[in-house]
UniProtKB/Swiss-Prot annotation:
Provenance organism: Pseudechis papuanus (Papuan black snake)
Protein's name in the database: Phospholipase A2
Cofactor(s) the protein needs: Ca(2+)
One Gene Ontology term, aspect cellular component: extracellular region
Residues at the active site: H18
Lineage of origin: Eukaryota, Metazoa, Chordata, Craniata, Vertebrata
GO MF terms held by the record: metal ion binding; phospholipase A2 activity; toxin activity
Cofactor remark: Binds 1 Ca(2+) ion.
Post-translational modification: Contains 7 disulfide bonds.
UniProt record similarity statement: Belongs to the phospholipase A2 family. Group I subfamily. D49 sub-subfamily.
UniProt-listed GO biological process terms: arachidonate secretion; lipid catabolic process; phospholipid metabolic process
Top EC class, one word: hydrolase
Keywords linked to the UniProt accession: Blood coagulation cascade inhibiting toxin, Calcium, Disulfide bond, Hemostasis impairing toxin, Hydrolase, Lipid degradation, Lipid metabolism, Metal-binding, Platelet aggregation inhibiting toxin, Secreted, Toxin
Length: 34
């Protein structure tokens, strides 16, 4: 599903760009989306 793949990339990028643990809670690790 292309939309899911797009979201996966977005969430991964979100986690990479947020250093604060509290902010990271809003991002899901890539592996949980498979």
């Amino acid at each position: 599903n292309l939309i899911q793949f797009s979201n996966m990339i977005q969430l991964d990028r979100c986690c990479e760009t947020h250093d604060n643990e509290a902010e990271k809670k809003g991002c899901y690790p890539k592996l949980t989306l498979y």
